[in-house]
Regions:
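Conserved, well-structured interaction surfaces
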Residues: 90-168, 202-212, 220-233, 442-449, ...
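Hydrophobic-face positions in mid-chain alpha helices that act as interaction patches
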Residues: 270-450, 454, 488, 513, ...
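Short coil/linker segments at helix-helix boundaries
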Residues: 164-215, 257-295
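Sec-dependent bacterial lipoprotein signal peptides
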Residues: 1-22
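Structural register within alpha-helical repeat arrays
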Residues: 147, 154, 161, 247, ...
Length: 585
């Protein structure tokens, strides 16, 4: 089962060579993708078409072969984003199929798959928009919710895509100079709409940020209007609350950018005059954007009966982080064996279920929290039990001659099974239905995953009011939240007096709360926060102990558009390859 990483990367290169026969953007027809010409205008057919969107969230094997270990849908994108940060080490990297990505030495192929996956997904959303729009224009108003799904999903995908692939300064002179020479600053990715022709695909420039923002906002506005009072059947579909959440994310990205750059703000204001059909943002300052963050975060929080996870829900051994509840605003839906891949190295759950005998844990491949972050979690914070305290790790238990699970942890593991757990191993993500035995490989992977939780909206709101109401008000709000929902004794104090101190305190809470959910990557990038894996006692393998530069984006967080895309679309602008730009200290 253990594989040579060079072989894996080479295999990916072969696959990408096959894909390069046709543009990644141009030819993307996954097997479970509904093509407009195959769909009638009946509501049943339109429902089938719209169902292809949540289905594609969990689609694996989009390269058309089973040898690509980084090809398991949207959860794979989340996993990759977290391993590029600083809180996600592995206990033993012998079976780490992401080693060349995690140590930053060979990144180009790692960025190819997300580019292909996202544009394949966008193709799917465009198909939904094209067909349902025709139906609505033909008088079928019951198709509006399906149209809203298309616009909402497409907005989410472009929001991710531009944040991943836009080049931001790294502090590495050779990279930043190369980016400047290429003219890549301020550019994102090409926009492909349902109306984009094949001819246009061959000359489709990378959109500047000020166009991309307005394009995404326009999609979100269209989605909000189309969804109306739509009541969804499950949380893999979007309703207005999810659109509010996506607007919150977008406004926050803009707010951070314009706070840092008056020139970018001026360009955005000027772009409001463009007659490209995307509408206007109507802002004059970064604080206007922060006010919008606060507004839409509140709308999202109060749009439904959302409430933060309780300790019981968080740590439930059957449903913890695998079953939708009142905290989840949006997520995947996996409820049948037909939706899963039973290769443990090929799924989110195979890599993240520390308790499961069928997972990669059987090869000592545990995803852990970083020592630096774990040390910041108070003993009064019940989330602390989501990771194994070094004093409770298997080697300590064995040395002490104990044969039971230490007190305080909620698990179905026996003492004998616990004795294999390394320090800092995660207990956050539970196997489906609590299926952790060797025979539960199928049952344990019938598990959903949150893509947006209400807690994120609270954190975004706190950051926004730090700018609009002041640090003192935001610090008090954060303190109240943590004491109400996460501490057992109300002892948490947020003592921040400056904006920098508040952002530091807030990021600690984001990193703890959202660990493993693929979201803090975007916070690091928009706030120019450094990655720090090299420090005394670090539990990262030495070759992975990369430290990026303060005040800049870590080089590996600037995804690189595949070079062969330029062969099909000469108008696209490519950023420099960040591989090896920073090495372990």
């Amino acid at each position: 089962m253990k594989r040579n990483i060079n072989h894996i990367i080479a295999a990916m290169g072969v696959a990408l060579g096959v894909l390069s026969l046709s543009s990644c953007i141009e030819e993307t027809y996954p097997n479970n993708q509904a093509v407009p010409g195959q769909i009638s205008s009946s509501n049943k057919s339109l429902e089938y078409l719209a169902n292809s969107l949540p289905s594609f969230l969990t689609t694996w094997n989009t390269y058309g072969g089973s040898d690509y270990t980084q090809d398991w849908g949207y959860p794979c994108q989340m996993y990759m984003r977290d391993l590029l940060c600083e809180d996600f080490p592995m206990s033993d990297n012998g079976y780490n199929y992401w080693s060349y990505t995690e140590d930053g030495s060979s990144l180009r192929y790692a960025y190819y798959y997300p580019f292909y996956y996202y544009y394949a997904f966008i193709k799917n959303a465009n198909n939904v928009i094209s067909t349902t729009k025709s139906s609505v224009e033909g008088g079928n108003k019951s198709a509006l919710p399906y149209l809203g799904q298309g616009y909402g999903y497409r907005a989410m995908l472009y929001l991710d895509l531009y944040r991943l692939y836009e080049y931001r300064k790294t502090g590495v002179a050779s990279l930043d100079d190369a980016a400047d020479k290429a003219g890549v600053y301020g550019l994102t990715v090409p926009i492909v709409k349902e109306t984009t022709s094949k001819t246009e695909l061959g000359n489709n420039p990378s959109a500047p940020f000020y166009t991309m923002y307005r394009f995404i906002m326009n999609d979100l506005n269209m989605a909000e209007e189309a969804l109306g009072d739509y009541s969804r059947s499950n949380k893999a579909f979007m309703d207005k609350s999810v659109i509010y959440g996506l607007k919150t994310r977008l406004w926050l990205a803009m707010a951070s950018r314009f706070e840092q750059s008056a020139d970018d703000l001026a360009k955005q204001i000027e772009a409001d005059k463009n007659e490209d059909g995307y509408g206007t943002l109507g802002i004059t300052s970064a604080n206007d954007c922060f006010a919008k963050v606060a507004e839409y975060a509140q709308k999202a929080i109060h749009a439904d009966t959302y409430k933060p996870l309780t300790e019981a829900e968080w740590s439930d051994t059957n449903t913890g982080f695998n079953t939708a509840n009142d905290s989840w605003m949006f997520g995947t839906l996996v409820n049948s064996k037909e939706q899963i891949n039973t290769s443990e190295w090929y799924t989110f759950w195979g890599w993240m279920c520390s308790e499961a005998a069928w997972s990669m844990a059987q090869f000592n491949s545990y995803r852990c929290i970083s020592k630096a972050l774990y040390d910041k979690i108070s003993t009064k914070d019940w989330r602390r039990q989501s990771w194994v305290n070094p004093a409770d790790a298997g080697e300590k238990i064995n040395a002490a001659g104990k044969d039971s699970v230490p007190a305080g942890y909620k698990t179905k593991m026996t003492g004998e099974q616990w004795a294999k757990l390394p320090q800092y191993a995660n207990m956050k993500f539970r196997a489906g239905s609590g299926g952790i035995t060797k025979n539960d490989l199928e049952t344990g992977q019938i598990a959903s995953l949150p893509l947006m939780r209400v807690e994120e909206m609270y954190f975004d709101y706190f950051e926004a009011i730090a700018h609009t109401q002041g640090v003192e008000a935001a610090a008090q709000a954060l303190q109240d939240f943590v004491n109400t929902y996460r501490y057992t004794d109300g002892s948490y104090k947020c003592k921040a007096k400056t904006m920098d101190d508040f952002i530091t305190a807030l990021m600690v809470q984001r990193r703890i709360e959202l660990w493993g959910e693929g979201l803090v990557f975007f916070d690091y990038k928009r706030l120019n926060l450094p990655i720090k894996r090299h420090y005394a006692g670090s539990n990262y393998e030495p070759s992975y102990q990369l430290n990026s530069y303060a005040g800049y984006v870590a080089p590996w967080m600037n995804y690189m558009i595949p070079e062969d895309e330029k062969d099909r679309n000469p108008a696209v602008v490519l950023g420099p390859n960040p591989s090896g730009a920073i090495t372990a200290e």
